[in-house]
Amino acid sequence: MTTFSPREIVSELDRYIIGQHDAKRAVAIALRNRWRRQQLDPSLRDEVMPKNILMIGPTGVGKTEISRRLAKLAGAPFIKVEATKFTEVGYVGRDVEQIIRDLVEVGIGLMREKKRAEVQAKAHVSAEERVLDALVGTTASPATRENFRKKLRDGELDDKEIDIEVADAGSGMGGFEIPGMPGANIGVLNLSEMFGKAMGGRTKKVRTTVKASYTDLIRDESDKLIDNEVIQREAVRATENDGIVFLDEIDKIAARDGGMGAGVSREGVQRDLLPLVEGTTVSTKYGPVKTDHILFIASGAFHVSKPSDLLPELQGRLPIRVELRPLNKEDFRRILTETEASLIRQYRALMETENLNLDFTDDAIDALADVAVHLNSSVENIGARRLQTVMERVLDDISYNAPDRAGAAITIDAAYVREHVGDLAQNTDLSRFIL
């Protein structure tokens, strides 16, 4: 759990997302409140519930990206789901409890990586011994082993090929659910894991270079040093206390006027979400998981429906409302130049792999922003995603011919941008299909 202050969280988000200060503030406060809750007396800690957030704004303005970056910053189990993928219990499709099961799986992965990092130094020593066994055999004299160990550490043997035995991660068959007990996935996979542990696990022989072998061997040795039960227990605890669920497209399950047909099923999904957001216990193959303190961030464009079309009970469980504004020309300009991995920086780096130097003038950046704003207003507003379409169109020729122009320096100016997308941008009918 991060100890960043709300101000530090916002400045961290500013590196990747332009504008939307209100939304950043809301998620920063929500994340800081999780840390504050952990400092409380246990008797009061259980009473402090997370304040779930509803983000309202058009597509491509940063709703998903804010949540994704927040989860990465927090180092917390995070899952993004589309509300439209779920159906009411009894219908064909995924039921909403699967969200929590998937979140626990993410938590297990995070915890396993954390534990592996803790034992990496020990695992590296064991991995080195296994590489030496592969190089000189187990019966070699101590002097020979030390001689090869020195060469190994100096990198002299990095490209030598060796045969190593590593755990066979692909062994075993999928489990099956016990009827009437969703989530209790006790099956062949679990049985094979149990027998695997008893008999030392299944292995496979792999031929690889000395340098490349370390990745598999360190992972293998790390897994021998960590306790799976501890991982599962701590992952469930982390999921319950720090987990973040991002519910996208929630406006698509808002009931509209005339409550027949699909609308009834949409309302059913909302009713199924209620206990999850309010706090319930979900059965998973790692044990029961309480959802009381999981933070839910819902988002939607609400073009056709409005937040008040959601069930009143669900509205009440999303107390913090944040509106994200549409992007203007200045925002597009900043997205192209100021973000940590801006599109211009990405394309420059891609072309450098072909030994091609790509440069954009200030008026080219203005022209790109102009075209994106014009297309969003005249065709369909898809926010910052429009920039990717425009950039691909502008750089199409350069990308195609890059291998033949190695060593060249290309400067893109406003005239070049207009030449490649100007006509299409002006012709609205064509733009609808091409840009």
UniProtKB/Swiss-Prot annotation:
The keyword Nucleotide-binding applies. It comes from the Bacteria. GO terms for molecular function: ATP binding; ATP hydrolysis activity; peptidase activity; proteasome-activating activity. ATP binds at residues 18, 60-65, 248, 313, 385. Keywords: ATP-binding, Chaperone, Cytoplasm, Nucleotide-binding, Stress response. Belongs to the ClpX chaperone family. HslU subfamily. This is ATP-dependent protease ATPase subunit HslU. It comes from Rhizobium etli (strain ATCC 51251 / DSM 11541 / JCM 21823 / NBRC 15573 / CFN 42).
